[in-house]
Design a protein with these regions (language model features):
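PLD/PLD-like phosphodiesterase catalytic module centered on the HKD motif
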Residues: 1-148, 188-340
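A structural/positional concept
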Residues: 133-187
Length: 340
């Protein structure tokens, strides 16, 4: 996972060593991240001469931290990385790669707070480094994964502490739309909950089904109505109409998965956890939440995107009418693949 750090942010980060969050964040940087400094080593050496706010003692502290980080650092450390482009733009994520969309940005830019408040990517300015990094630490015991027993859940509110900024929310659950009476308590409640950190135009891509494969009964959900309701409910949270796309009758994915830029959710049962009265009905035994900071999670996310892209390509080839909606995503493409 890439972390981009401006010079002023490095100074601020090292200065926060006494914060209780620092140890875990520092461990994550050392063990899980590729660190990309947007300035050169020479720039760092000149810090105390260029800016009278910084003493030689502060520079010594930074270099001591740097020396400690280099010992056993598992990721790459790069200097003079000219990314992201400056000045920052609120729509800069539109041109990001998949890796860029799941990176952390610690930047000294006049628009950094504006971009942060949009909730599309994890970004913060000087003084906000630990707040940004700690969003990827989700458990005191095992820093990057959390397991719940769904049978003990009271509501979807349990997810509040684990929602991160996002551009895309990809939901895979073939049973999610089979029972209209469960939409409010599950489908709609879930898409709303996943949007709580965002004030931007989100992309929802939902892989589901319009047939109960066990009984082989077609139920014909009103996809246009479902899409309209999702748009309305999410707009009430984010202020923007989301893009909503459904992909139907997929064959290769049985797991119930929710993918976002920084978190991966796995459910052992369909996400229809509650009945129309909000009472728990799931028979699932686990709901796992994994942070992109974990190398294993990053591999799973990469495989997931590849698999879902293959599903889309197959549906386009066989019957493109089974893809309904806006067909917009930062992670998935909806064009006919080029045959070589």
């Amino acid at each position: 996972m890439n972390v981009y750090i401006d010079k002023q942010n490095l100074v601020s980060y090292v200065h926060s060593m006494k914060d209780s969050r620092f140890e875990d964040c520092n461990s994550m940087l050392k063990k899980c991240c590729d660190i990309n400094f947007t300035f050169t080593k020479y720039d760092l050496d000149q810090l105390d001469q260029e800016d009278d706010r910084f003493s030689k003692e502060a520079l010594v502290q930074i270099k001591l931290w740097m020396s400690t980080m280099m010992q056993g650092c598992k990721g790459k450390v790069r200097w003079g990385i000219n990314f992201p482009p400056r000045p920052l733009k609120t729509n800069m994520h539109n041109n990001f790669s998949h890796e860029d969309l799941s990176a952390v940005y610690l930047l000294d830019d006049e628009k950094v707070i504006t971009v942060k408040n949009m909730g599309s990517i994890i970004v913060d300015g000087p003084g906000g480094e630990l707040s940004a990094l700690s969003q990827l630490i989700i458990n005191d015991d095992n820093l990057y994964t959390k397991m719940f027993n769904p049978r003990e859940l009271e509501s979807w509110d349990i997810l509040d502490a684990y929602i991160s900024p996002a551009t895309d929310i990809i939901i895979v659950d073939r049973f999610l739309a089979l029972d209209e009476s469960l939409y409010e308590s599950n489908l709609y409640a879930l898409v709303e909950k996943l949007a709580i950190k965002s004030k931007c135009k989100l992309n929802y891509i939902i892989f589901s089904d319009d047939k109960d494969r066990a009984s082989r009964v077609a139920i014909a959900p009103d996809w246009d109505n479902i899409r309209s309701k999702i748009k309305r409910k999410v707009k009430n949270i984010t202020g923007y109409d989301p893009n909503v796309t459904f992909i139907l009758k997929y064959k290769v994915e049985h797991d119930r998965t929710v993918f976002t830029n920084y978190k991966l959710f796995h459910s052992g049962d369909t996400c229809n956890y509650f009945n129309s009265k909000g009472e728990l009905i799931t028979k699932g035994r686990y709901l796992n939440i994994d942070s992109i900071a974990s190398k294993d999670c990053r591999k799973s996310c990469s495989s997931f995107i590849e698999d879902m892209q293959a599903v889309i390509n197959d549906v386009i080839r066989i019957n493109s009418d089974l893809i309904k909606g806006d067909k917009k995503s930062c992670f998935l493409k909806f064009e006919q693949p080029v045959q070589l």
